[in-house]
């Protein structure tokens, strides 16, 4: 099971690389936000998960897979290019611009809310015009001028390269978050599930898989 960002931009490459090593491997990839993936893990619907937020360290093993960062995505137009030329950071635009938000329960939303608290702000202070559970739909809305959004740098990499979107670092030190591989502490994995976990915990194998995404 995988939450939205790893499920779209990381896990397919990981599983494809593992399948080359283990041709008999078969899997079903279930999607949800980070909270839903935790629930699926606890209920036994999945044995291995990928999430962008830690919520139950007493019951769940979290292995850091990927260092992601969150950026403020904006349309590539004259208005936002002027901010870029002035060296403006994303946090300076959060309270000023219409905002398209991820759904509550997503790792991205959790990371953003934690970040806002460090600034003495809350999500309620943003000019939220929509809550959307799909980064691809959010990117379309942002490029169409609906507002700005805080998204994974992974999610907007292609659009930034082709000039559809601009990506602003949130502040000088960047807003980082970790994508985790999760398993239940109390669960015994099958032989193939354990092989997958061991494969993903190998840094050089993981890097090769990430290059396929």
Where are each of the predicted segments found?
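Secondary-structure junction motif
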Residues: 81-84, 98-120, 189-193, 197, ...
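Short beta-strand->loop
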Residues: 61-71, 127, 161-175
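A late-sequence structural motif
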Residues: 10, 166-210
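Hydrophobic hinge/microswitch elements
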Residues: 33-38, 42-46, 51-52, 113-117, ...
């Amino acid at each position: 099971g995988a939450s939205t960002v790893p499920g779209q931009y990381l896990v397919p490459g990981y599983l494809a690389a593992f399948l080359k090593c283990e041709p008999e491997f078969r899997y079903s990839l279930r999607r949800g936000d980070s909270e839903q993936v935790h629930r699926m893990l606890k209920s036994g619907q999945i044995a291995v998960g990928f999430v962008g937020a830690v919520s139950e360290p007493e019951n769940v093993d979290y292995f850091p897979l990927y260092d992601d960062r969150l950026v403020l995505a904006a349309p590539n137009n004259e208005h936002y290019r002027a901010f870029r030329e002035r060296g403006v950071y994303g946090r300076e635009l959060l309270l000023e611009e219409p905002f398209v938000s991820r759904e509550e329960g997503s790792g991205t939303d959790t990371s953003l809310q934690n970040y806002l608290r460090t600034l003495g702000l809350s999500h309620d202070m943003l000019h939220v015009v929509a809550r959307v559970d799909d980064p691809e739909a959010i990117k379309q809305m942002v490029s169409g001028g609906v507002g700005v959004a805080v998204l994974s740098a992974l999610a907007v990499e292609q659009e930034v390269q082709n000039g559809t979107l601009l990506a602003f670092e949130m502040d000088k030190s960047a807003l980082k978050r970790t994508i985790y591989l999760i398993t239940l502490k109390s669960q015994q994995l099958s032989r193939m599930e354990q092989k997958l976990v061991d494969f993903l915990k190998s840094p050089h194998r993981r890097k090769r898989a990430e290059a396929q995404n």
